[in-house]
Structures are given as C-alpha cells and as structure tokens.
C-alpha cells in the first residue's frame, strides 16, 4: 500500500486499487454497463454524516489499510491499524482508537509473498477464532512505482494479538514486473449471510474492482472463486475476474436493514455510496456521501486527501451495518506534508423512508473554538486538535452535498487567512475566498438560498475583538459577534 511519489493529480478520495497503489477517481461518474441494478427505492435512503473525530495522528506511519476492528469478550474493542506492519489498539468504544499500539503482524522474510509487509484488511469473528484477511506485498521498489500484491488468510485464537498464516487465498493473473504495481489486493471481506464470504479487491493493472467468494464453512486457500463474465467459476489463486464497474472502490460492508452489499466509490463531486442486491451489480446513491475537491497525493499541497475509507458499524465495529455507521479514513489536511497524517472516525446515520426524500444527504457543519488562537472555525471537515486545543462549541445544521434540486442554492467554501496574526477561518460563498486573499481549503457544501421546510438560517458573523469569522444560526450571532450577511438556509436535521 506504499505509493510512489509523483506529480500527477489524484482526486481527494483515493481507493488502493490502481497501478501505483491508489485509484484516482475520475472527474465524472462513469458506467460500463455493470453498475445498473437499482436498490428498492434508492431515492428513499436518507443519510446524515455527523461529526468527524480524529483518533490518531499526526504521524506518517499510520492509517495505510482499511481500518478493521472486533469487539472483545469484555465489551471493549480492538482495532487494527497498518503501515507495512499491523498494530492492535484497544479502546472502550469503536471510535476510541487513540491508545497504545502493539505490533501483531510484521514483514515477512526476503523472497516471501509478504516480504514488504502485512496489512490486516478485515478481522472476522468465527466462534472463538478470529479470521484475518491480510493484504501482502513483495518485490517492492516503491520509489519506482513497483510492488506485487496478494491476499492471505490468517487465524488468531487470542483476539488478534498473534496470528497463524494459512497461506494465500487471492492472487492475480500477472507476475511481479519492474516499474509496475501488479497482482490483486487491498480487499475488504464481508459475510453475505448466504453461506459465503465475499471479497472486493483492487487490480492494479487496469484499476478494476473485482469480486471473489468462498464458503463460510471453509474460506481457506483453494476455496475462493472469482466472478468472471457473469459466473463464479474462476479460481481465487491466479484466475481472471470481471471488473464490477468504474467508479467503485474496494471498501465493502453489508447493510442489515435490507441485506444489500454497500461499496464506497466515486461519483461526480465526491465520495459515493453504491448498493447491490446480488453482490456484483451496483447502483449509486444520487448524491455524494461527502463533497471532495480534486486532491494531490504528493504532499505538501493546497488540497486535502482522504484515503482508505471503510464503513463500520458504530455499535459493534464490524461491517454488518445497522442504521448507525462509522466512516473511517486516512486524512491529510490542506497544505500539510505526508507526516501530517490522521486517522478519522465519522458518524453516519442512515434510514429508509416509504417515499423519496430530497435532499438525501446532509453533512454536519460544526463550530470549533480555540481560545488561545482566538479562532472560531465553522467547518464540515476534520479539525486537527479536535477537543484539545479546539473545543466543539456548537452544531449549525447540515450542508447538502450537491446543489438543491429545482431550488436556488448557494455553494459555500471553507477558507482561512493569517492576516490578524492568527488563523481566521471563514465560511463564504464560492469565489469569495480568492477575491479577498483568503486561502481556499475546500468546498464545504450547499445551502438553500431561501427558507425551506426543516431548514435553519446560516449567518456569517464576525467577532471584532478576536478578529475572527464564524457561522451561526442566530441573527444576533449568539452575542459572540455581529452578522455580516445571511449565507442561506442549512438543513435542520
């Protein structure tokens, strides 16, 4: 999962499936014929993306896998973070993953299929045993864009503190090649509750996402079968597989409310949710889950980068999802270098209505306050130093991830200036930041231009004493400053 340096542009959501180790999502949602089947009333799904919480970082050697975790017999949780080696972290809650890390998987011996590292991608309880699905790399020369990927199965009898390798379960059709990323890997695994485990994997040679499955009764080496040309009939070891469609990522889960498989992926404007009722044919939610601007993998850069996103259940930490999810991802803030990397957990609440809902997706706008910097920061993004030194002050409604359908809306940007001698974060209309010499950080989202049912006003305010802008739902700016203008109307809930 290491990535070769290079000047090329990558979009801000990255999925580890392409030739250099990451998949740069296209600028348009694309469809090659496989992404076609519709979920029952996909327009009836309502999603609210909540507060981001930074659990680990900054550090360069974290968050290089799809984060995975299990619940322990005592009710606590054990998460697994990887960066060549895999580390176990214990916490009281699924998102409480800031504690000490201990190494549980290491790079293999020279010449082995895991000589460059073992990244635990998914931990699956099976009785008192934990199944570990491990991403491996060998023949790596990361500075030249070269590595060779595969997946193996390991088991643990002590809840992930030690592992026994049972061998490879998924390999590609190609061999290690100088200057190229080859093989198949970066898989996530889920129990389809139909007697099969399903794997969704990246194939670097063509940027494809592919599927394989194995019986729950025996998911070991030689029992995985890939999906190829409409059938499950190609061996997991060395067999061919059909691409499931452009725009998909390899981060999968199962939504227990309807039994559907859910993949994260890319659609126009941001990170998307894709649903399937047959494990192989996916349809996207019409609105992005998160708004994401184009980003640059090579750091530092003015853009931000989200990588290795995965969905976990907010109560159990597994990937059998209730209606309360966590979106977990690696994060590089704008203008920061590679060493400023964070692991972020974000609440996502999902529900199904009996009729179509508009808008479907809303992302929480939170306001943080750092008294030492005299900075109030109204943002939809993760805030380095969240909870200390930045304290959560209030929540100001939800921003839409696309322009309001059929109704005038306003696109808002998140930006910052250092002119007062400290950060002055500003939420403003698109174009305002550059016109007023603020550094643009990101697209924050959209608000309605006029009041709509279940919306709240959103004002841009200014505190003259602190020389700090902020957003508020109150016309008197909660007596923290004075209103400069009405930005629009955010979703109330």
What feature does the model see in each segment?
Residues 305-316:
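A short, acidic, amphipathic alpha-helical segment used as a generic capping/interface helix at domain edges
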Residues 10-21:
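Bacterial N-terminal signal peptides
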